[in-house]
């Protein structure tokens, strides 16, 4: 959704809200949320990772149609390529060989391989803003972004719509600023050390005017043990924010993701996200976050250079009424409840819109012949020559009639 070009204005009942009241989203804000921009500042509390600057040649490879992976081991033609017209070496002169795409970015290819080894043999990749979470369907590791080789990394990156968004649409919805264009983006590949994450311990925090106004879990499943931990988790997140992010991050509005494993006393910064519609509000809505009533700061407007620093202690004349209101307010902490629809698997799986049918994946894995056979059968089904079967039907069951799907 494009960002509005005007700030929020007062509306009456006769003037309904027609768009989310975001302030203009700047390109500089998007750049501030790029991993390489903030990682050095907060490195001590982030997950172990390495950043590799990317070259135009590597970016061109990511943008190319199709998936051609570098050869990791020596490969040999199948026996049927040998015939009477073969050369003295025994191989067909007409055999086509794909050029190795990594030859165009050999240094980066080498860096990726060395970094994977340095980080223990398993990594999770991402670009400046996004990880290829929507492409895990194609991974050899079932529903995982774990990569053990450079080719694992390339396969996920080239199969992801999220990565394409980083490359082609990073500034979509931003206010016009001729001084910043896509050419100003220094794209990087981030490789994080892989470890088995407990999804129940991941949380997204929303910051407005340098104050956390909402916290929620990232994984949309029900975890009953989290509810008694809300005070502990909220306190840990608030203390981390006040100590680390509140006064140092360049923008006053943003969201950030944290990981808090047992014993729930150490906060790890996972990501910083733009305060923009492109960021998933998860258990909140953007309208809630933008219009939520929050007590004003004790001494004026937050993030204002004209506001003096808070005193260490209140004066004797201060009746403390405002302090009570301020100190008594806490950000809402939302979790999936047992009876919430999100807690059950009736809805579509996460990122299902980015996945391909299993039949297509299996056909592609079997090579060109498999795809040709799949396309031929699909055309025959569309023309009525071949019957479509309902899910769960057994084509070998002679007792039941095969019922065609009417579309």
UniProtKB/Swiss-Prot annotation:
> Which compartments is it annotated to reside in?
Cytoplasm
Question: Could you tell me one molecular function GO term of this UniProt entry?
Answer: ATP binding
**One cellular component GO annotation, for this chain's record?**
cytoplasm
Pfam families per the record?
D123
Residues recorded as binding ATP, renumbered to this chain, are 126, 129, 131, 133, 192-195, 202, 204, 218, 257, 271, 273
**Superkingdom, taxonomy of origin:** Eukaryota
What ranges does the record list as Acidic residues composition bias? 90-100
Instruction: Please name the InterPro entries in this protein's record.
Output: CDC123
Where, in this chain's numbering, is Mg(2+) bound? 271, 273
Would I find Magnesium among this entry's keywords?
A: yes
Work out whether the entry's keyword set contains Cytoplasm: yes
Tell me the Gene Ontology biological-process terms attached to this UniProt entry.
Answer: eukaryotic translation initiation factor 2 complex assembly
Region named Disordered: 73-101
Keywords, sorted A to Z: ATP-binding, Chaperone, Cytoplasm, Magnesium, Metal-binding, Nucleotide-binding
Role? ATP-dependent protein-folding chaperone for the eIF2 complex. Binds to the gamma subunit of the eIF2 complex which allows the subunit to assemble with the alpha and beta subunits.
What family classification does the UniProt entry report for this protein?
Belongs to the CDC123 family.
The entry's protein name is Translation initiation factor eIF2 assembly protein
The source organism is: Sclerotinia sclerotiorum (strain ATCC 18683 / 1980 / Ss-1)
């Amino acid at each position: 959704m494009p960002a509005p070009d005007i700030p929020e204005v007062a509306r009456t009942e006769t003037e309904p809200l027609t768009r989310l009241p975001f302030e203009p989203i700047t390109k500089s804000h998007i750049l501030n949320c790029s991993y390489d921009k903030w990682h050095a500042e907060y490195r001590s509390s982030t997950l172990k990772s390495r950043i590799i600057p990317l070259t135009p040649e590597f970016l061109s490879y990511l943008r190319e149609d199709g998936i051609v992976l570098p050869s990791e081991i020596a490969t040999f033609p199948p026996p049927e390529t040998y015939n009477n017209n073969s050369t003295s070496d025994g191989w067909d002169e007409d055999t086509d060989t794909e050029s190795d795409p990594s030859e165009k970015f050999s240094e980066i290819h080498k860096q990726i391989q060395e970094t994977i080894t340095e980080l223990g043999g398993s990594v999770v990749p991402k670009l400046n803003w996004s990880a290829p979470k929507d492409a895990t369907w194609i991974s050899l590791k079932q529903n995982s972004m774990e990569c053990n080789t450079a080719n694992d990394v390339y396969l996920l990156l080239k199969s992801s719509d999220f990565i394409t968004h980083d490359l082609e649409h990073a500034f979509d919805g931003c206010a016009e600023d001729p001084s910043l264009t896509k050419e100003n983006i220094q794209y990087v590949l981030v490789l994080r050390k892989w470890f088995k994450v407990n999804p129940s311990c991941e949380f997204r925090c929303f910051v407005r005017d340098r104050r956390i106004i909402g916290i929620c879990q990232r994984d949309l499943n029900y975890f009953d043990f989290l509810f008694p931990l809300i005070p502990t988790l909220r306190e840990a997140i608030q203390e981390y924010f006040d100590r680390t992010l509140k006064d140092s991050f360049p923008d006053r509005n943003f969201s950030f993701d944290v990981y808090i494993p047992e014993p729930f006393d150490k906060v790890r910064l996972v990501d910083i996200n733009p305060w923009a519609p492109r960021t998933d509000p998860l258990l909140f809505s953007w309208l809630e976050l933008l219009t939520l009533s929050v007590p004003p700061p004790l001494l004026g407007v937050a993030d204002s250079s004209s506001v003096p620093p808070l005193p260490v202690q209140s004066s004797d004349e201060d009746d403390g009424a405002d302090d009570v209101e301020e100190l008594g307010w806490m950000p809402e902490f939302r979790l999936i409840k047992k009876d919430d629809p999100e807690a059950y698997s009736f809805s579509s799986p996460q990122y299902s819109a980015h996945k391909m049918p299993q039949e297509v994946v299996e056909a592609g894995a079997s090579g060109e012949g498999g795809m040709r056979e799949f396309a031929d059968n699909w055309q025959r089904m569309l023309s009525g020559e071949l019957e479509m079967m309902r899910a769960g039907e057994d084509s070998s069951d002679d007792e039941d009639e095969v019922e065609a799907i009417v579309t």
